[in-house]
């Protein structure tokens, strides 16, 4: 099994609910290590840049508006199969379809305000991590 890194974002809805620690606890119980973290209030330009892949999608403007509505917690998770493991912890994008015990089932309200973001593949994980962190800001443990 490969040790990987993945980007995770705790979105404005979950930050506002004051559940960052509960989410971090889930990551750590699953064997993932937090190797970088910061809280940031994204600008419109940052959010548009991060979600540029969705620019032509009908939900793009709503997504950007939501992501700039309050601070987010951005972290890099490291561990065996971190990308898949994080996506399993998150659950389905639509909280109504998310399995019991997943972050989105437990903490998300809607498909838009769905608590967390996670990279979906090694290539996107690398790009997303580099969007938020310099190499010397990642602290392997």
UniProtKB/Swiss-Prot annotation:
According to its UniProt entry, one GO biological process term is: GTP biosynthetic process
> Has keyword Cytoplasm?
yes
> Where does the source fall among the domains of life?
Bacteria
Phylogenetic lineage: Bacteria, Pseudomonadati, Pseudomonadota, Gammaproteobacteria, Chromatiales
HAMAP family recorded = NDP_kinase
What is this protein's record name? Nucleoside diphosphate kinase
Species source reads Alkalilimnicola ehrlichii (strain ATCC BAA-1101 / DSM 17681 / MLHE-1)
The record's PROSITE patterns line, in alphabetical order, gives:
NDPK, NDPK_LIKE
Give the Gene3D superfamilies listed for this entry: Nucleoside diphosphate kinase-like domain (3.30.70.141)
Its biological function?
A: Major role in the synthesis of nucleoside triphosphates other than ATP. The ATP gamma phosphate is transferred to the NDP beta phosphate via a ping-pong mechanism, using a phosphorylated active-site intermediate.
Task: State a single Pfam family of this protein.
Answer: NDK
Assembly mode: Homotetramer.
Provide the catalytic activity annotation.
Answer: a 2'-deoxyribonucleoside 5'-diphosphate + ATP = a 2'-deoxyribonucleoside 5'-triphosphate + ADP; a ribonucleoside 5'-diphosphate + ATP = a ribonucleoside 5'-triphosphate + ADP
Query: Hey, which family's this protein in?
Result: Belongs to the NDK family.
Q: Where in the cell is it found?
A: Cytoplasm
Q: Major place of localization?
A: cytoplasm
Q: Does the keyword Phosphoprotein apply?
A: yes
Catalytic activity, EC: 2.7.4.6
């Amino acid at each position: 099994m490969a040790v990987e890194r993945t980007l995770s974002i705790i979105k404005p809805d979950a930050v506002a609910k004051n559940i960052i620690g509960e989410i971090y606890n889930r990551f750590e119980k699953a064997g993932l290590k937090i190797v970088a973290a910061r809280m940031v209030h994204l600008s419109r330009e940052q959010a548009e840049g991060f979600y540029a892949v969705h620019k032509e999608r009908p939900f793009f403007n709503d997504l950007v508006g939501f992501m700039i509505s309050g601070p987010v917690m951005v972290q890099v998770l490291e561990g065996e199969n971190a990308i898949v493991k994080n996506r399993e912890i998150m659950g389905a994008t639509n909280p109504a379809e998310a399995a019991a015990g997943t972050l989105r089932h437990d903490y998300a309200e809607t498909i838009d305000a769905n608590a967390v973001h996670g990279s979906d593949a090694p290539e996107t994980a690398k790009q997303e991590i580099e969007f938020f962190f310099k190499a010397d800001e990642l602290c392997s443990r």
